Amino acid sequence: MAFPELLDRVGGRGRFQLLQAVALVTPILWVTTQNMLENFSAAVPHHRCWVPLLDNSTSQASIPGDFGRDVLLAVSIPPGPDQRPHQCLRFRQPQWQLIESNTTATNWSDADTEPCEDGWVYDHSTFRSTIVTTWDLVCDSQALRPMAQSIFLAGILVGAAVCGHASDRFGRRRVLTWSYLLVSVSGTIAALMPTFPLYCLFRFLVASAVAGVMMNTASLLMEWTSAQAGPLMMTLNALGFSFGQVLTGSVAYGVRSWRMLQLAVSAPFFLFFVYSWWLPESARWLITVGRLDQSLRELQRVAAVNRRKAEADTLTVEVLRSAMQEEPNGNQAGARLGTLLHTPGLRLRTFISMLCWFAFGFTFYGLALDLQALGSNIFLLQALIGIVDLPVKMGSLLLLSRLGRRLCQASSLVLPGLCILANILVPREMGILRSSLAVLGLGSLGAAFTCVTIFSSELFPTVIRMTAVGLGQVAARGGAMLGPLVRLLGVYGSWLPLLVYGVVPVLSGLAALLLPETKNLPLPDTIQDIQKQSVKKVTHDIAGGSVLKSARL
């Protein structure tokens, strides 16, 4: 008796699975708030140099005459590229000649300026404080802001490697429980840190634990659910991220101080840590590591919740031992990473699949973590992205079955790329249009994630499928780390980051057209199955009078 049959006995889609889904998907909403947090905690408010005439009461008292604030600002700070007060320069001495009505640009362009030696004055009308205002991450230090975001995303990459190994060794539920605790503790400490490096360190720890939460949530949902209900559970898990974006915008709207916001999104994980001790360990994992007595107890617990106690009474350690013998060995074919890179039928599939994964992570996190560049009301924009993501994820499943994998993958990358490129041409004054294009683009990237997850699983044989998918996820996280850093190109032109964010998904989407279609094809189990599919494709195309170059891919 294999494990799926054991699960059917105790109930693979019953009351327990419903309760487990609620318990596991609820933290996913708050995981999303951690991922998107720095849209708000690292927001850059309007700012200018501190100047004595405006910000020092003694200097103000010595001003001859009665001048308004705008006049004092004009004689203290030169205009910036957008004709607003310059954010990083001030006049060394007040330029009183600028008050004259016949003043031209020459009157101030030759005046001596200097950096903001005495600090900055920030606009607190939207945020009481952010990490930018706390540690002055502007002007010469502006690169530190996207660096903090990249450090967080690097933590997810490291955490995925560490937690993946730990969950295979120590169990899914145990690693999940301690991941909840690490998020809550590290997130709370990050909110109290007095220096920027320490803040980044604890945000890195939060991210590594976030990876553990995401990975082990998916594992427990799948390993305690029947094959028929598995896609539903994965859909609920994906929708948790969508609702989480709405939650992020709502919480940030109500909490405008970055320290309090960091605390607000970290505190719920203490509750998740407490109730996670109730969750059962994966019986499938317990069987594979030979812990049959504990596996039997967990199966009986699930059966009791699903009201199948009579069926559970028929389970014994001997039955579980036979199930352990029937579990497939993941190393049966000796397939390795080199197989993906050196096998002609798999090499190009691997590279293009990784390119699609990279394009998603690079573009999504590059844009989703800088909503200020896409619209004026970032609270509403964050919520709208989550709302649009809901039907997009559901609709992408329908389109995959109708249009096929290859076309859906290509269009779900090309469309957001075109939306991003179009935003270059839209003036900042047209905020509604810019926000609409941004929401459409980021929503389409949600479809791209759904497509690449399914498509990459079908492109590779069973013996090396998880290696290929894991390689793709590494590419996505690598892209996510690089994405925020592209914003540093903005010093050479505000349009340049958007150009890069737009070109990468367009080129990746076009490359996806070189992949073979996998719609309605049986999943390949061996490398020989891939080669047979290629031969059939070539034969079919020759019979039809055309030979596609992608047939060997």
From Swiss-Prot:
Expressed in the proximal tubular epithelial cells in kidney. It holds the Pfam family Sugar_tr. Glycans are attached at N56, N102, N107. Gene3D superfamilies: MFS general substrate transporter like domains. Keywords: Cell membrane, Glycoprotein, Ion transport, Membrane, Phosphoprotein, Transmembrane, Transmembrane helix, Transport. Its main location: membrane. It catalyses: urate(out) + (S)-lactate(in) = urate(in) + (S)-lactate(out); nicotinate(in) + urate(out) = nicotinate(out) + urate(in); urate(out) + n chloride(in) = urate(in) + n chloride(out); orotate(out) + nicotinate(in) = orotate(in) + nicotinate(out). GO terms for biological process: cellular response to insulin stimulus; monoatomic ion transport; organic anion transport; renal urate salt excretion; response to xenobiotic stimulus; urate metabolic process; urate transport. N-glycosylated. The modification Phosphoserine is found at S534. The chain crosses the membrane at residues 16-36, 146-166, 182-202, 204-224, 232-252, 260-280, 351-371, 378-398, 407-427, 435-455, 466-486, 495-515. The keyword Transport applies. GO terms for cellular component: apical plasma membrane; brush border membrane; membrane; plasma membrane. Electroneutral antiporter that translocates urate across the apical membrane of proximal tubular cells in exchange for monovalent organic or inorganic anions. Involved in renal reabsorption of urate and helps maintaining blood levels of uric acid. Mediates urate uptake by an exchange with organic anions such as (S)-lactate and nicotinate, and inorganic anion Cl(-). Other inorganic anions such as Br(-), I(-) and NO3(-) may also act as counteranions that exchange for urate. Belongs to the major facilitator (TC 2.A.1) superfamily. Organic cation transporter (TC 2.A.1.19) family. This is Solute carrier family 22 member 12. It comes from Rattus norvegicus. The lineage of its organism: Eukaryota, Metazoa, Chordata, Craniata, Vertebrata. The gene is Slc22a12.
